[in-house]
């Protein structure tokens, strides 16, 4: 039985980490693509040479032409300029929008049936542009955001309570930025909602508020520490979880940037919501009930995303006709 082909557009820190994780999980053969000659080829060879030690048989290829991604089952897009200290995800808009147009054209020509996961920032606007540029069905194009943001929230909570991360569930909705919405009432430790843990004295509301704020600024915290780049281990792990759910038809419920066209009262917008990912892509959008402050925060986050999408429309009006 032939292995799936997984194409990685962009061979920087996230791309290289993705390739290694995919190999370790034996999800398929990997094509690393980059416009920088030698970089994808070098990383592909380096990772391939680790396979005898780690015990996996995936094949790795580096390429500078989109032809190499032909027939890919999954395409993960990391191409673009990364964040630097003092730079917001939104500052990247005009630069990375052009990249998405080029990448979308390449996917449309060589891998039109793939499941596409976008990681490039500003995430929600870039996945919207990528879907428009590629012309692919919206259910086959998603953005990696909520899985990462929820993982950060889960880690901070597990650290706070000194419990296993496996026993912590958490959902972060909305845009992948400072307006994201970590949902405290839908987050639990061994099934116990966080508000109940406040009542029994495990933590305080003030401490939970601090953890929520840290989650919102999780990416910036790492950018400021690294000084020369942004996070790559956790983003790569998050994208691999999404790809695995698709390739193995696991039907996991994951928070991702998904295309909404009526759900949550929102149209023609990509924003973070829980979805079921299976062999058909996004097989179901889970509409949870949002009320009060949660709904206000979600609407504010959606408004921020729509502002970025509107900016994309002004910069590249031809996207609307695709």
Swiss-Prot record:
Keywords: NAD, Oxidoreductase, Tricarboxylic acid cycle. This is Malate dehydrogenase. It catalyses: (S)-malate + NAD(+) = oxaloacetate + NADH + H(+). One of its GO terms (molecular function) is L-malate dehydrogenase (NAD+) activity. Its EC number is 1.1.1.37. Substrate binds at residues 83, 89, 121, 152. Catalyzes the reversible oxidation of malate to oxaloacetate. One of its GO terms (biological process) is tricarboxylic acid cycle. The lineage of its organism: Bacteria, Pseudomonadati, Pseudomonadota, Alphaproteobacteria, Hyphomicrobiales.
């Amino acid at each position: 039985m032939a292995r799936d082909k997984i194409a990685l557009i962009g061979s920087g820190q996230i791309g290289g980490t993705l390739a290694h994780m995919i190999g370790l999980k034996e999800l398929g053969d990997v094509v690393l693509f980059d416009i920088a000659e030698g970089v994808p080829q070098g990383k592909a060879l380096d990772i391939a040479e680790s396979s005898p030690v780690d015990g996996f048989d995936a094949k790795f290829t580096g390429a500078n032409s989109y032809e190499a991604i032909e027939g890919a089952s999954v395409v993960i897009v990391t191409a673009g300029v990364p964040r630097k200290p003092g730079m917001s995800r939104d500052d990247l808009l005009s630069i990375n929008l052009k990249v998405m147009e080029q990448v979308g054209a390449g996917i449309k020509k060589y891998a039109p049936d793939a499941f596409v996961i976008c990681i490039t920032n500003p995430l929600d606007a870039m996945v919207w542009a990528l879907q428009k540029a590629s012309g692919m069905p919206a259910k086959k194009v998603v953005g990696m955001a909520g899985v990462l943001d929820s993982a950060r929230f889960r880690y901070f909570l597990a650290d706070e309570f000194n419990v296993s991360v496996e026993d912590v569930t958490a959902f972060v909705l909305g845009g992948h930025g400072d307006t994201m919405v970590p949902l405290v009432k839908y987050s639990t430790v061994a099934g116990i909602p966080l508000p109940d843990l406040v009542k029994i004295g495990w933590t305080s509301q003030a401490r939970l508020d601090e953890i929520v704020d840290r989650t919102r600024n999780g990416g910036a915290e790492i950018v400021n520490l690294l000084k020369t780049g942004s996070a790559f281990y956790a983003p790569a792990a998050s994208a691999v979880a999404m790809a695995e759910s698709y390739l193995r038809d696991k039907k996991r419920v994951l928070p991702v940037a998904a295309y909404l066209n009526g759900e949550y009262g929102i149209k023609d917008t990509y924003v973070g919501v829980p979805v079921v990912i299976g062999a058909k892509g996004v097989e179901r959008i889970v509409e949870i009930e949002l009320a009060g402050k949660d709904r206000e925060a979600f609407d504010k986050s959606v408004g921020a995303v729509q502002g970025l999408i509107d900016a994309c429309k002004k910069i590249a009006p031809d996207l609307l006709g695709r």
